[in-house]
Structure formats: structure tokens, C-alpha cells
Curated annotation (Swiss-Prot):
UniProt-listed GO biological process terms: L-histidine biosynthetic process; L-tryptophan biosynthetic process
Lineage start: Bacteria, Pseudomonadati, Pseudomonadota, Acidithiobacillia, Acidithiobacillales
The protein's name: 1-(5-phosphoribosyl)-5-[(5-phosphoribosylamino)methylideneamino] imidazole-4-carboxamide isomerase
Superkingdom, natural source: Bacteria
UniProt pathway annotation: Amino-acid biosynthesis; L-histidine biosynthesis; L-histidine from 5-phospho-alpha-D-ribose 1-diphosphate: step 4/9
EC code(s) of this entry: 5.3.1.16
GO MF term set: 1-(5-phosphoribosyl)-5-[(5-phosphoribosylamino)methylideneamino]imidazole-4-carboxamide isomerase activity
Localization (cell): Cytoplasm
Pfam families the UniProt entry points to: His_biosynth
Listed InterPro entries: Aldolase_TIM (IPR013785), His_biosynth (IPR006062), HisA_bact_arch (IPR006063), Isoase_HisA-like (IPR044524), Isoase_HisA-like_bact (IPR023016), RibuloseP-bd_barrel (IPR011060)
Broad class of enzyme this protein falls into: isomerase
Length: 242
């Protein structure tokens, strides 16, 4: 199972939010490239980068910082989400060196967009499903839809996406532990890999997710835990990927 460090960008800084609240942020660094280097040196094979400003504004805002990370680490797999609403934006990111582009809000608002994107950019499209209280949230998590996460996941899995990133918003940035039962239920319901996100606090929780690798959980994203030191990324990565 791949362990993936998260870099969340807001105003050019690397931050962590609590439960996706833009006003409840902690700044960990003002240098995204140096932050990426830190995780590369710790053995990261992939980075999860979110343009938080982009997610709220509906268009890429921190693309320059993301392009700089791509340029600095051409061999690193980078997956990017936040504010991606058009094929032109997807193309710009891929040309900059991004490996996977994550579609969230637009997947919910315009379901045909995902199918079209997988045709235009085969091998590059992931879908982010962000849930709160059993429903899918959009617009930087500010709006709750009526969609059931599993129903949505099954629909997009049929479109030929590379993976689904499943986030439990109530756990995100809280170090309260991932929602393993909901993540496993979703992974078992779809034939594509699922990457777990939200709530990881320690090594025990990483290994609890790894125990469900056979159910389709192929990766886990960690943010606050590795920045605050409750999880040693290098040690956890070695065990997760063993």
C-alpha cells in the first residue's frame, strides 16, 4: 500500500485545515518545493497536492507552485486536485508533469465530464469523493449533495478512472483515525483502486488500512500527522509498502 504525503496549498503556503474549514488552517511552510523535497528524501514515491484556493474559487490558483514541484522532481508521481473544472486545466497540469489529475466537484456537477476526461487523458484521471454524514460534498467541501458515495463511486469506476480518493471530511485534519469501515465498504463495491484519506494519526492506523489491501485499498494519504510528528513518515512508508 502506497503511503502518500499531502501538500495542501493556500496563498502559496503549505497548510493543513481541520475538517476542510478554510478559516481553521495551520501554516507548516512557506516553501512548497522544500516541503516536497522533505518527503522525497524520506522515500515518498508520490505526492498528493491540493490547491485549496482553487477548490473554493473553481479554478487553479496555486498552479505555479505545483509546476515548480513537478520541475524539481521529474521522477516523482504527483496527483493534484482542487478547482479542476475543464479539460484545458487538466492538459496544463499534465504538460507541467502532473501524473494524475483528481476531479471532485466537477465529477458531481457534470458526470459526463469524467467519462470525457478519461478518453482525452487515458491513465491520468482520478475522482475524489469527499463525504460527510454519508453524503458527497462539493465546492471545497462547502456544499453537501444528495449523492451516496458508493453509488457515485460505482458510476465513475465504469468510466475508466485510475483510482478513487475517498475522504471522510469529519476526520480530515483531526488526527481522530480514518473511517476504515466506510472506506472498506466503498473499496469492496468498486473494481478500481481506492486511496484512503482523512484522519490518519499514527502507524497503527496506517497498518489497519493496509490490512484491507486485498479489499482494494491501495494507498493512504497522510497530512497533519507527518507535519505534527505523530507519524514518522519514513518508518510508516516502509511498513505500508512492505
Amino acid at each position: 500500500m502506497l503511503l502518500i504525503p499531502a501538500i495542501d496549498l493556500k496563498g502559496g503556503n503549505c497548510v493543513r485545515l481541520r475538517q476542510g474549514r478554510m478559516e481553521d488552517d495551520t501554516v507548516f511552510s512557506d516553501d512548497p518545493v522544500a516541503t516536497a523535497q522533505r518527503w522525497v528524501e524520506a522515500g515518498a514515491k508520490r505526492l498528493h497536492i491540493v490547491d485549496l484556493d482553487g477548490a473554493v474559487q473553481g479554478e487553479p490558483v496555486n498552479a505555479h507552485a505545483i509546476a515548480a514541484i513537478c520541475a524539481g522532481f521529474p521522477d516523482l508521481e504527483i496527483q493534484v486536485g482542487g478547482g479542476i473544472r475543464s479539460e484545458e486545466q487538466i492538459e496544463t497540469y499534465i504538460q507541467a508533469g502532473v501524473r494524475y489529475v483528481i476531479i471532485g466537484t466537477q465529477a458531481v456537477k457534470a458526470p459526463g465530464f469524467v467519462a470525457d476526461a478519461t478518453v482525452s487523458f487515458p491513465g491520468h484521471i482520478m475522482v475524489g469523493i469527499d463525504a460527510r454524514d454519508g453524503k458527497v460534498a462539493t465546492e471545497g467541501w462547502s456544499k453537501l449533495s444528495r449523492h451516496d458515495p458508493i453509488d457515485l463511486a460505482q458510476r465513475f469506476a465504469a468510466d475508466g478512472i485510475e483510482a478513487i480518493i475517498y475522504t471522510d471530511i469529519s476526520r480530515d485534519g483531526m488526527l481522530s483515525g480514518p473511517n476504515i469501515s466506510a472506506t472498506v465498504a466503498l473499496a469492496q463495491a468498486v473494481p478500481v483502486p481506492v486511496i484512503a484519506s482523512g484522519g490518519i494519526a499514527n502507524l497503527e492506523q496506517v497498518l489497519a488500512l493496509k490490512a484491507h489491501e486485498s479489499d482494494g485499498i491501495t494507498g493512504a494519504i497522510t497530512g497533519r500527522a507527518i507535519y505534527e510528528g505523530t507519524l514518522d513518515f519514513s518508518q510508516a512508508r516502509a511498513q505500508a509498502e512492505a
